[in-house]
């Protein structure tokens, strides 16, 4: 997922020429496993530009040795143009569809944006939701300090790095329960309510929410604690489906 966010960020930053923060990522499904030795191709484009945010699409293909290239996943995400302190700033550049194909991409990206705005209408209230009492009995709590190497713009934590950490923690939770190899099958739509800064203490409250025949749903609630100002913010909550697999990568 870090590669996906990085590709989207690169495409978006080449357009805006400004720092960008990952604001959200839509439902993400992995259609094909990526194995060691596969050739991975990542394509990214900007589909829509708003006042301070934009929509990006990333398509990932994988090509195993002696096989045809296959679609691995398609990700849609939004970025917010910001200053080094995390405050939104206007995007001066605009894009115009050149043909009917691009017009369809433009309209669909705009529809996704409008749907997400409805989803995050209560963002200010969700930032204050720092309760961890409801994370369940099968839980794992991890504390992590945000270092300068976790940021690429100023003192703001990079969204791709956070997704990498979340994927790792959810995999640990799934493996501890399943007692075997697992793969990430999907990630539910994820919205960021507040930036994370260098020096913050991340609280990652992980819980096992559901168990099926071969799959599990893992949830992680992320809080960012400022030890200097003694404040805690709810940054995001992620839900992922992990699947237990055998030595050939088949569900078991």
Where are these regions (language model features)?
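Active-site helix/loop of acyl-thioester processing domains in fatty-acid/polyketide metabolism
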Residues: 1-20, 160-182
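HotDog/MaoC-like acyl-thioester-processing domains
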Residues: 35-39, 43, 47-117, 198, ...
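Short coil/loop residues immediately preceding or within conserved phosphate-binding loops
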Residues: 25, 141, 153, 182, ...
